[in-house]
Amino acid sequence: MLQSEIDISSCDLCPRVCGVDRGAGARGVCGADGRLRIARAALHFWEEPPISGTHGSGTVFFSWCPLRCVYCQNAVIADGEAGAEISIGRLSQIYSELQAKGALNINLVTPTHYAPHARAALDLARERGMGLPVVWNTSGYETVRAVRENRGYADVYLTDYKYASSDLAARYSKAPNYPQVALDALSAMVDEVGDPCFDEYEGDERMTRGVVVRHLMLPGALEDSKRVVQTVWEHFGSSVLLSIMNQYTPVLAESAKAGDAWACRELERCPELARRVPNEDYERLLDFADSLGIEDYFWQEGGAAEESFIPAFDLEGVLSE
C-alpha cells in the first residue's frame, strides 16, 4: 500500500477526532500531516522484562503525538522536532532489520496517528517472513474502534493509564475525557488479546499476548495514582500486568532553564512539575498496591528517574542502511 492510498481525509484515528484532511497536507491536533515520520528504530532495553529481555525490544518511535502531555519525557518527538519522513515500504524493511538484529518483538511507540501506515508495513514485512510479536505501545488515548482495527496486528498492548482524574487530564494533557476513554480502550484491548501469555525466545521469557498497563507517577499526584491502581485492579484484576513507574524526569523545568518560552509559561502554570517524585510517595503507592492484594506487578528501584531512560532521537535505524 502506498501512503497516497491511506484515507485520512477527515482524520478520526484518535479520540481528538479533529477531522482535518491530513492527506492533503493539513496537520491534525497530533501535529502530523499525511507523511510518515519516524525518529528512531533500534533495540531498546528499558521496557518491562518480558518486553525487552536481555536482547532488546525492536522499538520504532513515531514522531508527533495525539496526547501531547505538558511533561512529556519524549517531547522532542512528540513535538515533531526529531524524525525523518519515510515510505511504508521503508518502514516494513525496518521491521525486518530489527528482527535480524535479534529483537524480541516489534515495539511501535505512539503509533496511533499512523496506525494505517504501521499496519500496511506489517503486512509487507510479514510477506517477507517477519514473524515477531507486535507490541502496540500507546498513551492509552485510543478509540475502541482503533483497538478493534488492530486485530491481527497487535499481539501485546503496552498501554498507559495516566490519570483517574479528569481535572489532571485536562491540566496536563488537555484531555478531560482521558480517564473514561482510556478505560474503554483498555477493556477493548483485554478483549482483543486476552490474558498474558509468554514463551521463551533465545533464553528470554517473552510476552507474546496480553496487556501491560503502565502508570507513571507524577509529582504531587499520589492520591490520583492510588485511584489509577485501584481502578485497574478492580476492573481487570490479573487479566493485565500492572507496571508502576518511578521514572518521571522534570524535562519541562530543564527546558525552561534553557530559556524555552513555552516551557517557562507551562512551568509557571504547573510549578509542581519542576520536581521529581519523592521516593517516600512512590513507596506509599507500592504499599497501597500491596494492600489491595496485587501480588504480581512491575516496579522500579528508588531513584529510577534518569535521562538514561530517554533515548537519543538521532534517526538511528530510520534511513536505509
Q: Where do the language-model regions lie?
A:
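Conserved radical SAM core fold
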Residues: A78, A115, G140-T143, Y161-P179, ...
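Alpha-helix-loop-beta-strand connector modules within alpha/beta enzyme cores
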Residues: A121-V135, D184-E192, N279-L285
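Anionic-ligand binding region
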Residues: A170-G203
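Conserved Radical SAM active-site core
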Residues: G31-G152, V156-Y157, S165-S166
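Hydrophobic faces of well-ordered beta-strands that scaffold small-molecule active sites
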Residues: G58, I106, V134-W136, Y157-T159, ...
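Auxiliary Fe-S-binding modules of radical SAM enzymes
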Residues: M1-A26, D195-E321
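Alpha-helix N-cap and loop-to-helix initiation/capping positions
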Residues: I86, H113, S173-V181, G220, ...
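Aromatic/hydrophobic pocket-lining residues that form the small-molecule binding cavity
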Residues: L91, A118, V147, A182, ...
